[in-house]
């Protein structure tokens, strides 16, 4: 799911994707089959089943934030991938706070030179693994930060059958501090 969602390529979007098993973080490899017949889509709620990974993904948005819930199978290798996309991005994993912060700059023009979409993602489960990737999809194992043209963050954990991992996400075009404020004001 990309965030923000309104014409997201104009607004500097980033995405979250849950996967299991062998780590597939490259955007061309991590996609999953899903059926429109099995999805639930409303203005305030979206749910789908990611068949390739046996994960149920749900999201409910607010104006500047969203609450994600991923229901995992029993697996020793469960991951959530945050892709900050190209045109300049930064990610920083803060394990002791169960948090990823960063920014993305992807856009289709018509924005100021200093345009950034700052984001914060807060998880309700400790991270067993933490990785980032840098330009050209280079995996940086046990890394907590990356900055470049196209970077991302990967956090991982062992999950039990039906275990849910919740993620609170918010963004701001002003600052990381404002993204945190948006998260606290809109979804707590």
Report the location of each language-model feature.
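Accessory carbohydrate-recognition regions in carbohydrate-active enzymes
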Residues: 2-188
């Amino acid at each position: 799911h990309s965030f923000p969602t309104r014409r997201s390529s104009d607004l500097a979007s980033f995405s979250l994707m849950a996967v299991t098993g062998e780590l597939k973080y490259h955007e061309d490899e991590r996609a999953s089959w899903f059926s429109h017949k099995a999805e639930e889509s409303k203005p305030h709620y979206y749910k789908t089943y990611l068949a390739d990974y046996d994960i149920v993904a749900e999201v409910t948005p607010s104006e500047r934030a969203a609450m994600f819930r991923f229901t995992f199978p029993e697996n020793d290798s469960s991951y959530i991938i945050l892709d900050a996309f190209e045109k300049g991005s930064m990610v920083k994993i803060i394990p002791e706070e169960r948090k990823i912060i960063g920014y993305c700059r992807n856009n289709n023009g018509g924005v100021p030179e200093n345009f950034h979409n700052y984001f914060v993602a807060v998880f309700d489960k400790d991270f067993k693994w933490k990785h980032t990737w840098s330009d050209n999809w280079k995996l940086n194992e046990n890394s907590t930060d990356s900055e470049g043209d196209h970077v991302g963050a990967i956090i991982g954990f062992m999950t039990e059958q039906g275990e849910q991992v919740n993620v609170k996400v918010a963004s701001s075009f002003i600052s990381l501090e404002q993204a945190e404020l948006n998260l606290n004001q809109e979804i707590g």
